[in-house]
Amino acid sequence: MKTVKQIETPCEMPNGLQWTDDGLFVMDQKTDNVYVVDETGKLLRTIPTPTANGSGITVGGGFLWTTSNGNSVSRPSRSTDTGLGYI
């Protein structure tokens, strides 16, 4: 495997990627937002999610699926955190 290109991430803690025809979907563990970028790294859109401590993402069937880590020391807790891992 060979690295052919790197792009700047639109977020501080990228923790999930999914490439689609619409661009690269990047899950941010810190903000729980999903950022969609093109192949140059240009931000196309930001999608707020109800995810808590996001750790994974996939896109399909017209849906955006994310997963939560549950409790973590990776970022400060928020009042909306459940402390549970869920999809």
What are these regions (language model features)?
Residues 2-9, 42-47:
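A short beta-strand motif characteristic of beta-propeller blades
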Residues 7-21, 50-63, 67-71:
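Beta-rich, blade/repeat-based domains predominating
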Residues 2, 32, 82-87:
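Repetitive beta-architecture junctions, highlighting loop-to-beta-strand starts
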Residues 10, 26-30, 66-81:
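Conserved beta-strand positions in repeat-built beta-propeller and related beta-rich domains
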Residues 29, 38-39:
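Inter-blade boundary loops/turns of WD-repeat beta-propellers
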Residues 29-32, 51:
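Extended beta-solenoid/beta-helix repeat architectures
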